[in-house]
From Swiss-Prot:
Residues 269-670 are annotated as: FAD-dependent cmnm(5)s(2)U34 oxidoreductase. SUPFAM superfamilies: FAD/NAD(P)-binding domain. The keyword tRNA processing applies. It catalyses: 5-aminomethyl-2-thiouridine(34) in tRNA + S-adenosyl-L-methionine = 5-methylaminomethyl-2-thiouridine(34) in tRNA + S-adenosyl-L-homocysteine + H(+). The lineage of its organism: Bacteria, Pseudomonadati, Pseudomonadota, Gammaproteobacteria, Pasteurellales. Catalyzes the last two steps in the biosynthesis of 5-methylaminomethyl-2-thiouridine (mnm(5)s(2)U) at the wobble position (U34) in tRNA. Catalyzes the FAD-dependent demodification of cmnm(5)s(2)U34 to nm(5)s(2)U34, followed by the transfer of a methyl group from S-adenosyl-L-methionine to nm(5)s(2)U34, to form mnm(5)s(2)U34. Its EC number is 2.1.1.61, 1.5.-.-. This is tRNA 5-methylaminomethyl-2-thiouridine biosynthesis bifunctional protein MnmC. Residues 1-242 are annotated as: tRNA (mnm(5)s(2)U34)-methyltransferase. It comes from Haemophilus influenzae (strain PittEE). In the N-terminal section; belongs to the methyltransferase superfamily. tRNA (mnm(5)s(2)U34)-methyltransferase family. In the C-terminal section; belongs to the DAO family. The gene is mnmC.
Length: 670
C-alpha cells in the first residue's frame, strides 16, 4: 500500500503564469486568470443569484483541478461579500471540494500567489496548511468556507465521495488542463459521477466547448448550453441537472444518515477529548450544545493525563486505519493551532516523536512503515546516531522519526477549551450520570440517576467505554482498557530529552516547569479498576529500562508512586467508531441473509439506525490524534455536509462494521 502523490513539475512563462511541464498547458489564462474565473465559473454557475434564493444552510461546490487555488480564492471572496450583505440569510456556509492530481510545491505556490495580492490573507492561510503529499482528502477551514482538497487522480478520488454524496453538490467548476492536453481526465466516468453527485437543478460550468465534452455531459444527463467564451475563446459550456436518475447504493449497510433537526439542539454525553472535539465542530456550525459529564469535573477519565503524545498510528496492517490516522494527524494540528490562536492555555511542545526499534518485532513494524512512501515530515527512518541526536539522549537502536509529532497536556487542553466553549454558549452539566435514553417523536429524552429528564433533538454518545451502558448500544463490541501513567521527577540526564520517546511504552520530555515527566502506560483489558497499582508502576519503569538499555534510563524512578489511572475504550480491530448508532435488531433482521442477497443480486435496503443518535468512540490510546477529525466527521454527518474522509475510511469507522463483516460472509452475529 502507498499513500503518497507526486508534486507538479512546472515553470513560469514570460507573463509569470505557471505552466505544467506534465501537460504543457497554463494553469490559468495568460490574459487575466481572475477575470476568466469570474466569467466562466462564478457567472457560469450563476452563484450570486442562486445564493440569494438558496434555502439551506450550506452550498457545495466541487472542482476538478485545484491548481494554484485561484478559483477557490475568488469564490471564497465572493461568498464573504454575500455573507456581509446578507447576514440573516439562511445560507451560512460554503463547502468547496477540489481534486488535484499533482499539487504544486510550496515554493511554486508562493510564487504563483504573488500575482494576486488581493487574496493575501487566503493565500497565506492555504500556504500555512498546504498538505503533505498524502493521497486523499485534506480539510482546511477558512472561516465560513471549508476547503476539502483531495490529492491524487480524480478518477480514483471522486468515487470515494461515495453513496453519502449522491445528489449533494450544487455546482461544478469543470476545470483542469485542456481536454487535448489531458484527455485521461475528460471521460464518461467523470461526467456520470458528476451527474450522480449533483443535486436536482444543480449546475456545472467549464472553459471548454469541445464536442466530446459536450456530448459526454449530455449523455450523462445534463442539459448543456453553449455560451460566449472568455477572451479569445469562441465558446464555453454550462449546464443543469434537470432530471434525476435513480442510483443503486453500492454499500447501503454503511450509509451515513444526517440528523433531522429544526433547533440544532445537541446533547453530548461525555466530558473528555471526544466530546470536546465534537462540540467544537458543532459550535462552528451554529449548534446549541449541552454537555452531560458523569464526573464532578471535566477530563477526569482517559483524557485526564498531565502529558500525552500526539502522533499517528502507522503500524496497523489495515490500510484504511493508517489512512485515517495520517489525515487525523494533519487535521489535529490545525485544531491545536486554532486553540492556540483563541488563547486557550495548555502546555504543549511540537518536539517530534521517536519510535524505537527496540526488538525484532518493532523493527519489522517500522520497516513496513518505511515502505509506505510517506513524506519525511510525516515519517523517516533514522539510524541510532541520528535518532539519538533528535531525542537528545543516547539510544542503542535505530527507529522512526515523526517530525511533526508533539506532546500536550490533555486535561488542561480539554478543561480550558471547554471553558472557552462555555463563553460561546455551550452549556456544561457536571455530576450528571445519564442512565437511560428514550426516543421521542422528535429527538431524545435523557434520564439521569436522580430521575431528572432532559430533552434534546440530537444526542451524541462520547462517554468512552460506558457507551455500551445504554440498551441502544449494548451490542457494540467495545471493551475497556485500564492504563496507568506514572509521573516521575526529572533529573540532569532526563532534562536532556528533547522529544517524545516511544518503545513498548512512552516517555515524555519534561513538562514546562521542568519538574516532571510522564511514563506509561499499562494496558490491562477488561479492567475498570481505577485504583493505583504498584505492580504497574514498576512495570512502567522496567519497560523503559529493558527496551532502552542505556545508563541514563536508571534515572527513571517511579518509587514516589505518583500516577493516575484512566480507562480507555477500544475495539478488536483498533479503529475508532464514528457516525450513526446502528439499530442492532433491525439490521440483524435486514442483513442476517446479506451474503445470499448479494449473491442473488436482490435489492438491499439502507441501514436502519437510531434516528438522531450518534457516537464517537473507541479512541483507544490515540485520542489526542483521532478526536479532532472524528468530531469534524461527526458534525459533517449530522449536518448533511461533505465528509472530510473517504468512503472507504467511513466504512472502516462505522459502528456496525464488525456485524456487517460477518453478515457479508454468511456468519451469525450473536
Amino acid at each position: 500500500m502507498t499513500f503518497s502523490v507526486q508534486h507538479a513539475e512546472i515553470h513560469f512563462n514570460q507573463n509569470h503564469i505557471p505552466v505544467s511541464d506534465q501537460f504543457d498547458d497554463v494553469y490559468f489564462s495568460n490574459e487575466n486568470g481572475l477575470a476568466e474565473t469570474d466569467y466562466v465559473f462564478l457567472q457560469g454557475n450563476q452563484l450570486w443569484e442562486r445564493w440569494i434564493t438558496h434555502k439551506e444552510a450550506n452550498f457545495v461546490i466541487a472542482e476538478t483541478g485545484f491548481g494554484t487555488g485561484l478559483n477557490f480564492f475568488a469564490v471564497t471572496k465572493l461568498f464573504r461579500e454575500f455573507r456581509q450583505q446578507h447576514e440573516n440569510h439562511p445560507l451560512k456556509r460554503l463547502n468547496f471540494i477540489s481534486f488535484e492530481k499533482y499539487p504544486l510545491k510550496i515554493t511554486a505556490l508562493l510564487q504563483a500567489h504573488l500575482a494576486y495580492p488581493q487574496f493575501e490573507d487566503l493565500s497565506a492561510h492555504l500556504q500555512r496548511y498546504w498538505p503533505s503529499l498524502i493521497l486523499g482528502c485534506h480539510r482546511i477551514h477558512f472561516g465560513e468556507t471549508t476547503l476539502d482538497l483531495w490529492l491524487g487522480d480524480v478518477s480514483e478520488n471522486l468515487p470515494q465521495l461515495g453513496d453519502y454524496m449522491n445528489e449533494r453538490i450544487d455546482a461544478w467548476f469543470l476545470d483542469g488542463f485542456a481536454p487535448s492536453k489531458n484527455p485521461e481526465m475528460w471521460n464518461d466516468d467523470l461526467y456520470n459521477l458528476m451527474f450522480r453527485f449533483t443535486k436536482p437543478n444543480g449546475s456545472f460550468a467549464t472553459f471548454t466547448a469541445a464536442s466530446a465534452v459536450r456530448k459526454g455531459l449530455e449523455s450523462a444527463g445534463f442539459n448543456v448550453t453553449k455560451r460566449k467564451g472568455f477572451g479569445k475563446k469562441r465558446e464555453c459550456l454550462s449546464g443543469l441537472k434537470i432530471q434525476s436518475k435513480s442510483t443503486a447504493l453500492s454499500t447501503p449497510w454503511y450509509l451515513a444518515q444526517p440528523a433531522k433537526m429544526e433547533q440544532q439542539d445537541v446533547a453530548i454525553i461525555g466530558g473528555g477529548i471526544a466530546s470536546l472535539c465534537a462540540a467544537i465542530s458543532l459550535v462552528k456550525r451554529g449548534a446549541k450544545v449541552t454537555i452531560y459529564c458523569e464526573d464532578d469535573s471535566l477530563a477526569l477519565n482517559a483524557s485526564g493525563n498531565k502529558q500525552g503524545a500526539f502522533y499517528p498510528q502507522l503500524s496497523d496492517d489495515n490500510a484504511l486505519t493508517v489512512d485515517f490516522y495520517l489525515h487525523a494527524f494533519s487535521y489535529g494540528r490545525q485544531l491545536l493551532d486554532w486553540a492556540i490562536a483563541q488563547n486557550i492555555a495548555f502546555e504543549h511542545e511540537f518536539c517530534g516523536v521517536a519510535l524505537c526499534a527496540y526488538n525484532k518485532k518493532s523493527a519489522v513494524k517500522l520497516a513496513k512503515i518505511s515502505q509506505l512512501g510517506l513524506p519525511n515530515e510525516i515519517f523517516q527512518m533514522l539510524n541510532a546516531e541520528q535518532l539519538s541526536e533528535k531525542v537528545g539522549l543516547p539510544l542503542n537502536c535505530k527507529g522512526g522519526w515523526i517530525e511533526q509529532g508533539a506532546w500536550l497536556a490533555p486535561r488542561q487542553f480539554v478543561q480550558n477549551a471547554f471553558s472557552f466553549l462555555e463563553k460561546q454558549g455551550v452549556i456544561i452539566k457536571t455530576s450528571q450520570k445519564i442512565t437511560a435514553l428514550s426516543q421521542l417523536e422528535k429527538g431524545w429524552e435523557l434520564k439521569n440517576m436522580q430521575g431528572q429528564k432532559y430533552c434534546h433533538e440530537v444526542v451524541i454518545l462520547a462517554n468512552g467505554y460506558k457507551i455500551t451502558d445504554f440498551v441502544q448500544t449494548e451490542k457494540l463490541p467495545l471493551y475497556p482498557i485500564r492504563g496507568q501513567v506514572s509521573q516521575i521527577p526529572t533529573s540532569e540526564n532526563l532534562l536532556k530529552l528533547k522529544s517524545v520517546l516511544c518503545y513498548d511504552g512512552y516517555l515524555t520530555p519534561a513538562n514546562q516547569l521542568k519538574t516532571s515527566h510522564c511514563i506509561g502506560a499499562s494496558h490491562v483489558r477488561d479492567n475498570v479498576d481505577r485504583h493505583f497499582s504498584e505492580q504497574e508502576q514498576q512495570e512502567n519503569q522496567q519497560k523503559l529500562q529493558q527496551n532502552i538499555a542505556q545508563p541514563w534510563t536508571q534515572d527513571v524512578n517511579t518509587s514516589d508512586n505518583l500516577a493516575r489511572v484512566g480507562i480507555r475504550c477500544s475495539v478488536r480491530d483498533l479503529a475508532p467508531m464514528v457516525g450513526n448508532v446502528p439499530h442492532f435488531e433491525q439490521q440483524q433482521a435486514d442483513y442476517y441473509n446479506l451474503f445470499n442477497l448479494r449473491r442473488r443480486k436482490q435489492p438491499i435496503q439502507s441501514a436502519i439506525n437510531f434516528e438522531n443518535l450518534f457516537l464517537t468512540a473507541a479512541l483507544g490510546s490515540r485520542g489526542l490524534t483521532s478526536a479532532p477529525l472524528l468530531g469534524e466527521t461527526l458534525a459533517s454527518i449530522i449536518y448533511g455536509e461533505p465528509l472530510p474522509i473517504s468512503e472507504g475510511i467511513l466504512h472502516n469507522l462505522s459502528a456496525n462494521r464488525a456485524w456487517v463483516k460477518k453478515w457479508l460472509k454468511g456468519s451469525k452475529v450473536e
